[in-house]
């Protein structure tokens, strides 16, 4: 039986974990809730405990059967894995790859910005296979971007390369983004941004809509489901969301000129 490896995608709502062959074949996947309270101190211990439990279930030994782990973090990551601040998780002054390695008995762990490593994965095994230059955008709790040129991740001097979610796209915004800016793409085209746009649209219109039954608890999924069903207000929300996403992607395309 060959060595295995582990992939960890830390999101603002959940952490998705996969067990793989070193060839990239997925053997199992599962997730745990992202506990962001108290500065996110429980996130990595929860991940480590979940990995140990899964390995035990499969009769695998952490030290003998696992070659290492790769981890995606929703924010800027320095080349050595250091994270100065990750607002979506509450982290400050943390090296998550060192901490997760410590919690997993010292196995090798490498971390990077989630969208960057997702783009790398797509180039290796997914929709970007066969391409040397690509841009990937991730839409979740936030908006991330990964840029690969000549098969190399463009992370930048401070790990901020590809932070597409914080491109300024909207001049009529008045609330601050998590990054401290105003008018960022993430404020309108992320899952949380879609829900917020829906609440704003409901507040300024008397138009009937299936979204009204959810009130302030409306989610991005509710909006998407209603839009697919032809709900006029939901379609209006998605038109706004898509407009700003397209505006940002056009800027990126003109800047880096990717193949895909």
Labelled PLM ranges:
Residues 9, 68-74, 136-142, 146-148:
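Short beta-strand segments
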Residues 118-124, 145-147, 166-167:
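Adenylate-forming
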Residues 82-92:
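A charged helix-plus-loop insertion that forms the helical arch/lid used to bind
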Residues 30-32, 87, 157:
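Short hydrophobic alpha-helix segments
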Residues 111-113:
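Short loop/edge segments at beta-strand edges and connector loops
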């Amino acid at each position: 039986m060959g060595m295995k490896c582990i992939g960890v995608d830390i999101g603002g709502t959940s952490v998705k974990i996969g067990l793989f062959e070193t060839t990239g074949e997925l053997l199992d996947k599962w997730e745990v809730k992202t506990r962001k309270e108290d500065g996110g101190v429980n996130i990595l211990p929860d991940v480590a405990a979940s990995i140990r439990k899964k390995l035990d279930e499969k009769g695998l030994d952490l030290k003998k059967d696992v070659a290492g782990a790769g981890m995606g973090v929703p924010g800027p990551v320095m080349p050595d894995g250091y994270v100065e601040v990750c607002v979506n998780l509450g982290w400050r002054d943390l090296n998550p790859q060192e901490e997760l390695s410590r919690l997993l008995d010292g196995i090798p762990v490498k971390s990077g910005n989630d969208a960057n490593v997702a783009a790398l994965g797509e180039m290796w095994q997914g929709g970007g296979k066969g391409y040397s230059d690509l841009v990937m955008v991730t839409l979740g709790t936030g908006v991330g971007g990964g840029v690969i040129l000549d098969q190399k991740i463009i992370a930048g001097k401070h790990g901020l390369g590809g932070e597409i979610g914080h491109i300024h796209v909207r001049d009529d915004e008045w609330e601050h983004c998590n990054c401290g800016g105003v008018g960022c793409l993430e404020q309108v085209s992320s899952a949380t941004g879609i829900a917020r746009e829906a609440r704003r649209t409901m507040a300024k219109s008397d138009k009937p809509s299936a979204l009204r039954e959810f009130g302030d608890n409306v989610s991005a999924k509710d909006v998407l489901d209603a839009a697919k069903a032809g709900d006029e207000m939901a379609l209006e929300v998605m038109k706004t969301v898509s407009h700003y996403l397209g505006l940002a992607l056009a800027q990126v395309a003109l800047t880096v000129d990717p193949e895909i």
